[in-house]
Design a protein with these regions (language model features):
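Residues within well-ordered beta-strands of beta-sheet-rich folds
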Residues: 59-61, 106-108, 192, 215, ...
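Short, small-residue-biased leader/transition segments that mark boundaries at the very start
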Residues: 1-7
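Extracellular glycan-recognition/adhesion modules and their associated mucin-like linkers
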Residues: 8-32, 47-74, 88-122, 137-142
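Extracellular "leader-to-stem" segments immediately downstream of a signal peptide or signal-anchor
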Residues: 141-190, 198-200
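Trp/Gly-enriched beta-strand/coil motifs that build multi-repeat beta-propeller-like domains
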Residues: 33-34, 39-47, 81-88, 131-135
Length: 260
Protein backbone atom coordinates (compact mmCIF):
# COMPACT_ATOMS: atom_id res chain seq x y z
CA UNK A 1 0.00 0.00 0.00
CA UNK A 2 2.80 2.43 0.89
CA UNK A 3 4.62 1.98 -2.43
CA UNK A 4 1.38 2.42 -4.39
CA UNK A 5 0.72 5.65 -2.49
CA UNK A 6 4.19 7.01 -3.32
CA UNK A 7 3.80 6.14 -7.01
CA UNK A 8 0.41 7.87 -7.15
CA UNK A 9 1.63 11.00 -5.35
CA UNK A 10 4.57 11.34 -7.74
CA UNK A 11 2.37 10.81 -10.81
CA UNK A 12 -0.35 13.45 -10.49
CA UNK A 13 -1.66 16.16 -8.12
CA UNK A 14 -4.32 14.36 -6.10
CA UNK A 15 -7.34 16.38 -4.98
CA UNK A 16 -7.03 17.76 -1.45
CA UNK A 17 -10.27 17.80 0.56
CA UNK A 18 -11.33 19.72 3.66
CA UNK A 19 -13.85 18.07 5.98
CA UNK A 20 -15.81 21.02 7.38
CA UNK A 21 -17.86 20.61 10.55
CA UNK A 22 -21.61 21.18 10.46
CA UNK A 23 -22.64 24.88 10.18
CA UNK A 24 -19.10 26.06 10.98
CA UNK A 25 -15.99 27.23 9.13
CA UNK A 26 -13.87 24.73 11.08
CA UNK A 27 -11.97 21.99 9.26
CA UNK A 28 -10.95 18.56 10.52
CA UNK A 29 -7.29 18.99 11.46
CA UNK A 30 -4.42 16.68 12.34
CA UNK A 31 -2.53 17.58 15.51
CA UNK A 32 0.31 15.11 16.12
CA UNK A 33 -1.53 11.75 15.98
CA UNK A 34 -4.81 13.12 17.36
CA UNK A 35 -7.48 15.24 15.67
CA UNK A 36 -9.27 18.49 16.32
CA UNK A 37 -10.85 21.24 14.24
CA UNK A 38 -9.55 24.67 13.36
CA UNK A 39 -10.78 27.69 11.42
CA UNK A 40 -9.83 27.15 7.79
CA UNK A 41 -6.26 28.39 7.36
CA UNK A 42 -4.91 26.60 4.29
CA UNK A 43 -2.61 24.42 6.40
CA UNK A 44 -1.74 21.02 4.92
CA UNK A 45 -2.79 19.44 8.22
CA UNK A 46 -6.38 20.31 7.19
CA UNK A 47 -5.97 18.70 3.77
CA UNK A 48 -7.02 15.09 3.27
CA UNK A 49 -6.91 12.70 0.34
CA UNK A 50 -9.73 10.22 -0.23
CA UNK A 51 -8.44 6.93 -1.67
CA UNK A 52 -10.98 4.57 -3.22
CA UNK A 53 -10.80 1.02 -1.80
CA UNK A 54 -14.05 -0.46 -3.14
CA UNK A 55 -17.57 0.78 -3.77
CA UNK A 56 -18.45 3.11 -0.87
CA UNK A 57 -15.24 2.28 1.06
CA UNK A 58 -12.27 4.63 1.33
CA UNK A 59 -8.98 5.35 3.06
CA UNK A 60 -8.68 8.94 4.29
CA UNK A 61 -5.08 10.18 4.25
CA UNK A 62 -3.66 13.38 5.71
CA UNK A 63 -1.64 15.21 3.07
CA UNK A 64 0.86 16.72 5.50
CA UNK A 65 2.51 13.39 6.28
CA UNK A 66 0.52 10.63 4.49
CA UNK A 67 -0.85 9.24 7.77
CA UNK A 68 -4.16 7.36 7.70
CA UNK A 69 -7.34 8.20 9.58
CA UNK A 70 -7.70 5.31 12.03
CA UNK A 71 -10.36 4.10 14.46
CA UNK A 72 -8.98 3.21 17.89
CA UNK A 73 -11.94 2.14 20.06
CA UNK A 74 -13.83 5.43 20.65
CA UNK A 75 -10.87 7.53 19.53
CA UNK A 76 -10.11 8.74 16.03
CA UNK A 77 -6.39 9.12 15.37
CA UNK A 78 -3.88 9.04 12.52
CA UNK A 79 -1.31 6.29 12.02
CA UNK A 80 0.81 4.60 9.37
CA UNK A 81 -0.90 2.59 6.65
CA UNK A 82 -1.83 -0.92 7.81
CA UNK A 83 -4.42 -2.18 5.32
CA UNK A 84 -6.77 -3.03 8.21
CA UNK A 85 -10.49 -2.25 8.26
CA UNK A 86 -10.05 0.23 11.11
CA UNK A 87 -8.50 2.49 8.44
CA UNK A 88 -11.43 2.06 6.06
CA UNK A 89 -14.41 4.42 6.01
CA UNK A 90 -17.86 4.71 4.48
CA UNK A 91 -18.67 8.24 3.31
CA UNK A 92 -22.45 8.54 3.05
CA UNK A 93 -24.54 11.57 2.12
CA UNK A 94 -27.02 12.78 4.75
CA UNK A 95 -28.41 16.25 3.92
CA UNK A 96 -28.91 17.79 0.46
CA UNK A 97 -28.74 21.39 -0.73
CA UNK A 98 -31.49 23.16 -2.67
CA UNK A 99 -30.18 21.70 -5.94
CA UNK A 100 -30.47 18.14 -4.68
CA UNK A 101 -26.73 17.59 -4.20
CA UNK A 102 -25.34 16.28 -0.92
CA UNK A 103 -24.17 19.11 1.33
CA UNK A 104 -23.31 16.99 4.39
CA UNK A 105 -21.96 13.47 4.85
CA UNK A 106 -21.45 11.04 7.70
CA UNK A 107 -18.10 9.25 7.89
CA UNK A 108 -18.45 5.79 9.42
CA UNK A 109 -15.65 3.36 10.24
CA UNK A 110 -15.96 -0.03 8.54
CA UNK A 111 -14.56 -1.92 11.55
CA UNK A 112 -16.50 -0.28 14.39
CA UNK A 113 -19.60 1.03 12.63
CA UNK A 114 -19.16 4.32 14.51
CA UNK A 115 -19.18 7.80 13.00
CA UNK A 116 -16.60 10.57 13.28
CA UNK A 117 -17.96 13.00 15.88
CA UNK A 118 -16.91 16.57 16.72
CA UNK A 119 -17.02 17.42 20.43
CA UNK A 120 -17.22 21.21 20.54
CA UNK A 121 -16.72 21.51 24.32
CA UNK A 122 -13.05 20.52 24.16
CA UNK A 123 -12.53 20.71 20.38
CA UNK A 124 -11.78 17.00 20.09
CA UNK A 125 -12.71 14.31 17.58
CA UNK A 126 -13.94 10.83 18.50
CA UNK A 127 -16.17 8.00 17.35
CA UNK A 128 -19.75 7.32 18.40
CA UNK A 129 -22.90 5.63 17.15
CA UNK A 130 -24.52 7.77 14.47
CA UNK A 131 -27.60 9.62 15.74
CA UNK A 132 -28.15 12.17 12.94
CA UNK A 133 -26.69 14.86 15.20
CA UNK A 134 -25.01 17.82 13.51
CA UNK A 135 -21.76 16.99 15.32
CA UNK A 136 -21.53 13.90 13.08
CA UNK A 137 -22.06 15.67 9.75
CA UNK A 138 -19.29 17.00 7.53
CA UNK A 139 -19.01 18.91 4.27
CA UNK A 140 -16.58 17.68 1.60
CA UNK A 141 -14.93 20.84 0.27
CA UNK A 142 -12.36 20.34 -2.48
CA UNK A 143 -9.41 22.58 -1.68
CA UNK A 144 -8.76 25.35 -4.20
CA UNK A 145 -12.27 25.79 -5.60
CA UNK A 146 -13.56 29.34 -5.81
CA UNK A 147 -16.81 31.15 -6.52
CA UNK A 148 -19.94 29.16 -7.23
CA UNK A 149 -17.89 26.03 -7.94
CA UNK A 150 -17.14 25.97 -4.21
CA UNK A 151 -19.45 25.67 -1.21
CA UNK A 152 -21.33 28.98 -1.34
CA UNK A 153 -24.38 30.92 -0.19
CA UNK A 154 -26.97 31.83 -2.81
CA UNK A 155 -30.40 33.47 -2.75
CA UNK A 156 -32.01 30.03 -2.79
CA UNK A 157 -29.88 28.76 0.08
CA UNK A 158 -26.52 27.09 0.66
CA UNK A 159 -24.94 25.25 -2.27
CA UNK A 160 -22.66 22.24 -1.90
CA UNK A 161 -19.19 22.49 -3.38
CA UNK A 162 -18.39 20.62 -6.57
CA UNK A 163 -16.66 17.30 -5.84
CA UNK A 164 -16.42 15.78 -9.34
CA UNK A 165 -15.36 12.15 -9.24
CA UNK A 166 -13.98 12.38 -5.69
CA UNK A 167 -15.94 9.37 -4.39
CA UNK A 168 -15.22 7.12 -7.36
CA UNK A 169 -12.26 5.04 -8.42
CA UNK A 170 -9.26 6.44 -10.32
CA UNK A 171 -8.48 5.36 -13.88
CA UNK A 172 -5.47 6.21 -16.03
CA UNK A 173 -5.85 7.04 -19.73
CA UNK A 174 -3.26 7.52 -22.45
CA UNK A 175 -5.15 7.58 -25.77
CA UNK A 176 -8.40 8.72 -27.37
CA UNK A 177 -10.16 5.39 -26.89
CA UNK A 178 -9.50 5.08 -23.16
CA UNK A 179 -10.30 8.77 -22.53
CA UNK A 180 -13.59 8.62 -24.41
CA UNK A 181 -14.64 5.44 -22.60
CA UNK A 182 -13.83 6.98 -19.21
CA UNK A 183 -15.74 10.21 -19.95
CA UNK A 184 -18.86 8.22 -20.86
CA UNK A 185 -18.93 6.07 -17.73
CA UNK A 186 -21.94 6.99 -15.61
CA UNK A 187 -20.42 6.46 -12.15
CA UNK A 188 -18.18 8.99 -10.32
CA UNK A 189 -14.64 8.76 -11.65
CA UNK A 190 -11.25 10.46 -11.42
CA UNK A 191 -9.56 10.32 -14.83
CA UNK A 192 -5.79 10.86 -14.91
CA UNK A 193 -4.11 11.69 -18.23
CA UNK A 194 -0.74 9.90 -18.49
CA UNK A 195 0.10 10.74 -22.13
CA UNK A 196 -0.67 13.75 -24.30
CA UNK A 197 -3.62 13.04 -26.60
CA UNK A 198 -4.03 14.42 -30.12
CA UNK A 199 -7.74 14.45 -30.99
CA UNK A 200 -7.42 16.30 -34.30
CA UNK A 201 -8.44 13.17 -36.21
CA UNK A 202 -11.64 12.72 -34.19
CA UNK A 203 -14.78 13.73 -36.08
CA UNK A 204 -17.21 13.79 -33.16
CA UNK A 205 -17.67 15.75 -29.95
CA UNK A 206 -17.04 13.95 -26.65
CA UNK A 207 -19.71 14.01 -23.96
CA UNK A 208 -18.53 14.29 -20.34
CA UNK A 209 -20.95 12.49 -18.03
CA UNK A 210 -21.81 13.67 -14.50
CA UNK A 211 -19.41 13.39 -11.55
CA UNK A 212 -16.02 13.43 -13.22
CA UNK A 213 -12.62 14.81 -12.23
CA UNK A 214 -10.10 15.08 -15.07
CA UNK A 215 -6.49 15.58 -13.94
CA UNK A 216 -3.35 15.94 -16.00
CA UNK A 217 -0.35 14.01 -14.71
CA UNK A 218 2.96 15.73 -14.03
CA UNK A 219 4.50 14.14 -17.12
CA UNK A 220 1.62 14.68 -19.57
CA UNK A 221 -1.35 17.01 -19.34
CA UNK A 222 -2.21 18.22 -22.85
CA UNK A 223 -5.14 17.45 -25.15
CA UNK A 224 -5.04 18.82 -28.68
CA UNK A 225 -8.18 19.69 -30.64
CA UNK A 226 -10.58 17.85 -28.36
CA UNK A 227 -14.23 18.83 -28.58
CA UNK A 228 -15.68 18.31 -25.10
CA UNK A 229 -19.30 18.99 -24.20
CA UNK A 230 -21.57 18.62 -21.20
CA UNK A 231 -24.85 18.82 -23.10
CA UNK A 232 -26.68 16.12 -25.03
CA UNK A 233 -26.03 16.61 -28.75
CA UNK A 234 -29.71 16.05 -29.54
CA UNK A 235 -31.03 18.05 -26.58
CA UNK A 236 -32.89 15.10 -25.08
CA UNK A 237 -30.90 14.84 -21.84
CA UNK A 238 -30.10 17.36 -19.10
CA UNK A 239 -26.59 18.87 -19.23
CA UNK A 240 -23.91 17.08 -17.21
CA UNK A 241 -23.02 18.48 -13.80
CA UNK A 242 -20.40 18.18 -11.04
CA UNK A 243 -17.23 18.23 -13.14
CA UNK A 244 -13.70 19.30 -12.12
CA UNK A 245 -10.79 19.75 -14.56
CA UNK A 246 -7.32 20.23 -13.02
CA UNK A 247 -3.75 20.60 -14.26
CA UNK A 248 -4.80 20.33 -17.92
CA UNK A 249 -3.69 22.21 -21.03
CA UNK A 250 -5.96 22.38 -24.07
CA UNK A 251 -4.51 23.26 -27.47
CA UNK A 252 -6.79 24.21 -30.36
CA UNK A 253 -5.41 24.29 -33.90
CA UNK A 254 -7.62 22.49 -36.41
CA UNK A 255 -10.99 23.62 -35.06
CA UNK A 256 -10.72 27.02 -33.33
CA UNK A 257 -13.70 27.95 -31.15
CA UNK A 258 -14.50 24.27 -30.64
CA UNK A 259 -12.74 23.37 -27.40
CA UNK A 260 -15.89 23.01 -25.32
Amino acid sequence: MGSEMCIRDSLYPAQAVNFTAYTTARNLNKSSTSLNTQIASGSTTENWRIDYVSSGVYNIVNMSDNSYLTANETKCITSSASGNSNQQWNIIGTDKDFLGNYLYYKIVNVSTGKAITYYQKDNSIGLDQYTNDGAQKWKLNCYGLEGFAANSKMIEGEKAGTIGGLLGETVFVSDMKSMKEALLRTEPLTIVLTANIDCSGENYDWMIEDNKTIIGSYQANQMRDCKLRTNDYYGKLDPSDNIIIRNMKFQVEVNPNMLV
